[in-house]
Amino acid sequence: VHWTAEEKQLITGLWGKVNVDECGAEALARLLIVYPWTQRFFASFGNLATASAITGNAMVHAHGKKVLTSFGEAVKNLDNIKNTFAQLSELHCDKLHVDPENFKLLGDILIIVLAAHFGKDFTPDCQAAWKKLVRVVAHALARKYH
């Protein structure tokens, strides 16, 4: 994947402002609410029966932070995303059996969360760069499935 200097700047510039705890929790909660079938991968998280139960669930918050923290590794390693996510791809494929389509869904949700949090700073060019990034990350996570 080739990144232009502008794309790199748009991604890293916005990432520096992201509250990983808040945005991570919100992104995972939105995934579980908007795409309820994804809840089956989080059965050990307890009550996910309602939107308020999901948004108030400490395990959802903790895992959302973990997911977004790991996403930060992509931002730090834009030129080596495949290798950065090799172990996570293996884990999600071989042990967790996560449908790789869910990585794309989470990427789409992350775009919505970033747009909501950053408003005017999340310009169309910024959105395009982030859309490219979430697709590259989703592809890297799905790599072991192919």
Curated annotation (Swiss-Prot):
Tissue: Red blood cells.
A Gene Ontology biological process term: hydrogen peroxide catabolic process
Residues the entry annotates as binding heme b: 63, 92
Keywords attached to this entry: Heme, Iron, Metal-binding, Oxygen transport, Transport
Coiled-coil ranges from the UniProt annotation: none
SUPFAM superfamilies per record: Globin-like
Superkingdom, taxonomy of origin: Eukaryota
PROSITE patterns: GLOBIN (PS01033)
GO MF annotation list: haptoglobin binding; heme binding; metal ion binding; organic acid binding; oxygen binding; oxygen carrier activity; peroxidase activity
GO CC annotations on file: blood microparticle; haptoglobin-hemoglobin complex; hemoglobin complex
Residue ranges of domain Globin in the record: 2-146
Function statement: Involved in oxygen transport from the lung to the various peripheral tissues.
Subunit structure: Heterotetramer of two alpha chains and two beta chains.
Family statement: Belongs to the globin family.
Name of the protein in question: Hemoglobin subunit beta
Origin species: Ciconia ciconia (White stork)
Gene name for this UniProt entry: HBB
